[in-house]
């Protein structure tokens, strides 16, 4: 495991992630895009339940991408939300992003830090539609020269093997 970061650095990176989550909850998607590095990789794969005997052998069942997005693709998703023609978001979802168990370590790349957080994303829409997404995120954040931060990678791992929501139009 790589070296853990100082308490001060841990606090600053955590605050960046909390701010980023609040931008998503407040539907400030253009501001959220500004928090992303131009080289962002935003990914989520399907979760497959592997048998214990297979896991012991190191055998992983095949998965497929749910998201494998670049910044351009994320910009297009947001532009679509802004048109009012994204029917999956009419009326708009109300979300709450909760992150915890934040573990931050250095990487081999200067000013890039690996972050592991557990998350709960609550989504409410219409009168009775509620969905909880629970899992772990593996992020990489980059410190800029002006001491600001950018999200470089986000790999979203859902605990659920079956997604029961009508769609996945929310951002994690």
UniProtKB/Swiss-Prot annotation:
InterPro entries (alphabetical): 3PPDioc_HcaF, HcaF, NTF2-like_dom_sf, Rng_hydr_dOase-bsu
TM ranges: none
S-S pairs: none
Biological processes annotated in GO: 3-phenylpropionate catabolic process
Pfam families in the record: Ring_hydroxyl_B (PF00866)
MF terms in GO: 3-phenylpropionate dioxygenase activity
Enzyme class: oxidoreductase
Keyword Oxidoreductase: yes
Catalytic activity entry: 3-phenylpropanoate + NADH + O2 + H(+) = 3-(cis-5,6-dihydroxycyclohexa-1,3-dien-1-yl)propanoate + NAD(+); (E)-cinnamate + NADH + O2 + H(+) = (2E)-3-(cis-5,6-dihydroxycyclohexa-1,3-dien-1-yl)prop-2-enoate + NAD(+)
Key words, A-Z: Aromatic hydrocarbons catabolism, Dioxygenase, NAD, Oxidoreductase
Metabolic or biological pathway: Aromatic compound metabolism; 3-phenylpropanoate degradation
Family to which the UniProt record says this protein belongs: Belongs to the bacterial ring-hydroxylating dioxygenase beta subunit family.
Function text: Part of the multicomponent 3-phenylpropionate dioxygenase. Converts 3-phenylpropionic acid (PP) and cinnamic acid (CI) into 3-phenylpropionate-dihydrodiol (PP-dihydrodiol) and cinnamic acid-dihydrodiol (CI-dihydrodiol), respectively.
Quaternary structure and interacting proteins, as annotated: This dioxygenase system consists of four proteins: the two subunits of the hydroxylase component (HcaE and HcaF), a ferredoxin (HcaC) and a ferredoxin reductase (HcaD).
Protein name: 3-phenylpropionate/cinnamic acid dioxygenase subunit beta
Taxonomic source organism: Shigella sonnei (strain Ss046)
High-level lineage: Bacteria, Pseudomonadati, Pseudomonadota, Gammaproteobacteria, Enterobacterales
